[in-house]
Swiss-Prot record:
<protein>
    <recommendedName>
        <fullName>UPF0637 protein EF_3078</fullName>
    </recommendedName>
</protein>
<comment type="similarity">
    <text>Belongs to the UPF0637 family.</text>
</comment>
<dbReference type="InterPro" id="IPR053707">
    <property type="entry name" value="UPF0637_domain_sf"/>
</dbReference>
<dbReference type="Pfam" id="PF06335">
    <property type="entry name" value="DUF1054"/>
</dbReference>
<dbReference type="InterPro" id="IPR009403">
    <property type="entry name" value="UPF0637"/>
</dbReference>
């Protein structure tokens, strides 16, 4: 069973676009493929729909190496950004599992409004849940410290507004010592987010 280790976090210390991408392709992407295939198999019956694995290729980059990399699970075979999707990704200091709304997904105003009207779904999430309002930076906020009303209103009303919610596993977490526990924590994160996902796709 493949799982993230110190080696994968160290990939973001490799200098140069081609050099870092070579490490990402060789070390990180096979982990994404294996874990996401497993998560898709586990989540599909709960959702009643097939999920497809998408792995970021960073093809638009010509000079600067990526500071993070990610994969996505989506019912759309061709792409994922235009609709709610699950992400598994890694920065230099943590791995993230998000329910993600980026790049102006379809019906984002309706999704944001539905979330504003159903905030009890957020209250049901575990305390170690985090929120990201910009997928291009590593700064995230614990859900209990997030002004949810403000964050969701921004997601609804600002063209570049984004919203990602889920959990992380820090680089120094003890979970990495037990790959099966780490994988179970990741899967549980996605399962806890299913009510929000289902509300979003119903819009």
């Amino acid at each position: 069973m493949l799982m993230f280790t110190e080696k994968e976090f160290a990939a973001f210390e490799v200098a140069g676009l081609d050099e870092r991408m070579a490490v990402i392709r060789a070390q990180i992407q096979p982990i994404f493929q294996e874990l996401d295939t497993y998560f898709a198999e586990q989540l599909a019956p709960e959702l009643g729909t097939e999920l497809f694995v998408h792995i970021a290729q960073h093809r638009r980059r010509t000079v600067y190496p990526p500071e993070n990399t990610w994969s996505a699970l989506s019912p759309n075979k061709r792409g994922y950004k235009m609709q709610p999707h699950f992400q598994l990704g890694i920065w230099g200091d943590y791995v993230f599992m998000w329910l993600s709304f980026i790049d102006n997904p379809k019906n984002e105003k309706q999704i944001a409004q539905a979330f504003l009207e159903n905030q009890q779904l957020f209250q049901a999430l575990p305390e170690d849940t985090y929120v990201s309002l910009d997928h291009t930076v590593p700064q995230i906020t614990p859900l209990p410290e997030t002004d949810l009303e403000k964050a969701l209103t921004r997601f609804r009303d600002v063209k570049k507004g984004e919203f990602e919610i889920g959990r992380i596993i820090p680089k120094d977490s003890d979970l990495w010592q037990n790959p099966e526990k780490a994988r179970a924590y990741m899967l549980a994160t996605y399962q806890q987010l299913l009510p929000l996902y289902q509300l979003a796709v119903a819009q």
